[in-house]
């Protein structure tokens, strides 16, 4: 039985659910879950939690992500990416815009920004996913969402061809960001219809694409009984949370029994969440949170026995 976080390289053409389904067959276990959907036409790293590590998938999902994307100016599509039907078109003449204009616009999108999710997305409105409305030709009012763009930078020259302009960007962002929507919004600021024509996720939850492995490689490693070294311990998925290392056996027992604690008992500033680590084994024992009614107390959220 495997336990840990496996950075899978998702190839284009597969859904995130496909990856989980195939892994369950390869590893012969149902206790597998991914940490953030990647669209079928997007490739890149998809951290997958296996066994007890499924309990920390939310924390991996909440960590930042990085993407390499290609933006195409001159055409917008129904899906905001290269798979949709063209709905608006304006020829971009050679050298109609320059890198200074592009860089200035990109800078405007750093920080907390507002996005309207695309109709072809899994965001729910009135209990239904937006793509369900879109497939029926229906349009509904979509919620404006705030997302965080840590950084965005152009990584290529501008390429003009066939009335379009292409350029690459690298984006570091928070959970819930739609790069497709970012591409179309950048185009609007530059005065052109636009879409995202290529996307690769290069980092997710601290897992880099260079450390990811394909489903074929996973299958081979599993058959050779050499897959375990490629799994990261579940503690890795909690690295963004503050930690308290515990050596006192009595306190360890209380933690593993899910008891509450007075915050003054620990010589450390405690925010909303923290992780208790066994100082001897360096294994996580529990995740504790601020008590909702008693400011001086913390209570268990998840205990790992």
Swiss-Prot record:
EC number(s) on file: 5.4.99.25
Family the UniProt entry places it in: Belongs to the pseudouridine synthase TruB family. Type 1 subfamily.
Pfam family, one: TruB_N
SUPFAM superfamilies assigned to the protein according to its UniProt record, in alphabetical order: Pseudouridine synthase
Name of the gene this protein is made from: truB
Keyword flag tRNA processing: yes
EC category name: isomerase
GO biological process: mRNA pseudouridine synthesis; tRNA pseudouridine synthesis
GO molecular function, one term: RNA binding
Record-linked NCBIfam families: TruB
Superkingdom of origin: Bacteria
Name of this chain's protein: tRNA pseudouridine synthase B
Catalysed reaction, written as an equation: uridine(55) in tRNA = pseudouridine(55) in tRNA
Active site: residue positions: 39
Keywords: Isomerase, tRNA processing
Keyword tRNA processing listed: yes
Protein function: Responsible for synthesis of pseudouridine from uracil-55 in the psi GC loop of transfer RNAs.
